[in-house]
Amino acid sequence: MLKIGFFADGPWAHKSLEKIIENDDFQIMYIVVRYDSVDKVLVEYAKRLGVPLFKHRNVNSGDFIQMIKKFDIDINVSMSFNQILKKEIREIAPLGFINCHAGALPFYRGRNILNWVLINGEKEFGVTVHYVDDGIDTGDIILQQMVEISPDDRYGDLLEKAYIACADTLYKALCQLKQGTAKRIPQNTIHSTGFYCSRRVMGDEYIDWSWDSERIYNFVRGIAIPGPGARTFFKGEEYIIDKVELINDMPCYIDKVGNIVGKSTSGIVVKTGSNAILVTRVLNADTKEACAMNGFYIGNRFFADKHICPPPEHL
């Protein structure tokens, strides 16, 4: 029997927990949720399993550590938990503290990885189970799985793929740990540096129309709803550019970026830094409802910044 402490939040955790509890060789001893949120699904799981559910402002505090030591667990697992885990809590369990990260470590450490892999135009993304150490996503790798990204995948599609892949990879890693066959691969043996991705914040969602068309295409799908959506301004109002298509054989030429330079039955053609891109769906930024495309005319212009967007009568 492998006795597990589960530090977790959200759909990532729900899928993983569902798979773990199907195996009679695994026993969840307690569940620790984020202090700043309420995960009703994990609350119900704790009741169903008959295990305590903890919420603590600082899981590294002495009182919390003493409390969970009593459970005599074999391993602690982190799945979308948001507190830094210091040395003392990492060493409570004999098999250590492991984390499941939706990134192909040592690349794509950090935050908002599924957004970044799409923005970067990747053809696949990784899911990695690794030991937690003093760094951020730098611990030795136990197991890694690569997942294909299709050309039409958007942020929501990757989330669904990642929920399943994380659950599968974590489950396999726990099986290996129980059997004593788990690997321990230092990340610097894969690449000497790897790289980190920053947390995306408000203000990062605006399209720079001077980017080339492929970059705009990847940006739009990379932060599509349920993300914030790729934003732009038109006649002083904010809109979400929800879907775009690359235009085959579109020549490169110089013109004012953001200008609407054509229309078709599919949408509007907007000038980019390289050539032009077809915008097929625009949403109202407040209601998220689709806008009628006949309200956008050739010669009108999209802007990345409201403060440089001329008054409507000048557009």
Task: Enumerate the language-model features and the residues they cover.
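A conserved acidic, glycine/proline-rich C-terminal tail/linker
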Residues: 247-267
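One-carbon transfer enzymes
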Residues: 1-231, 237, 262-278, 284-288, ...
